[in-house]
Amino acid sequence: MSSMSIKFKKLNNTIIKCKKCPRLFNFIKKISLEKRKQNINEKYWGKPVTGFGDVNAKLMIIGLAPAAHGGTRTGRAFTGDKSGDFLFKSLHKVNISNQDFSKNINDGLKLKSTYITNILKCVPPGDKPKNSELIKCSNYFINELDQLKKLKVIVALGKVAFDNCLKIYKKKFNMNKKFEFKHGKKYLLPDKRILIACYHPSPRNVNTKVVTPLMINSLFKKAKKFSTL
């Protein structure tokens, strides 16, 4: 095990045990007890959800927070929900993942030089986090950015993830520049990494064709090229 993976293991253990935000802690416990009808016989993860993937990643994919009955249930980001289904079909198509599905933590999924995480490690009620919760959780995301020494490209899924990623960068680097969220648009960050805006592969966006498989595939092909995967 490399020293970097040891650091990640320590970070992830800290994240899993985190109880900094009582509102979020209580909400994920409530979800895990009440469950969803189709998952009533499953044991929910019911804790903060860490990032996963290659610790030597050149590409990072970020969302805002785990899904209530996706990551919060399975214990892995973009796993066991429709957004994840759509995302991994695309990642497999462009040879970033070894399979086109992400069902549970034991499904054999592997990522090629890619790390997937959320800015907020717990699902917030109504998918709307408080600013204080984002601030408390931001150090975990900063730690992930710092640990991924080879990281070159960040793809932000959705405007909220994009905006909050920039908030963290603005705080860290004292940035004043304005960044517009536009699908496929890329920006150079102060640490020389590239940030790419991407529509979120939510069921609503997919069903209304705001985002299509072709659009996502094309974007990740570009992300691979920029990160030289």
Where would I find each of the regions flagged by the language model?
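A polyanion-binding, active-site-adjacent surface
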Residues: 5-229
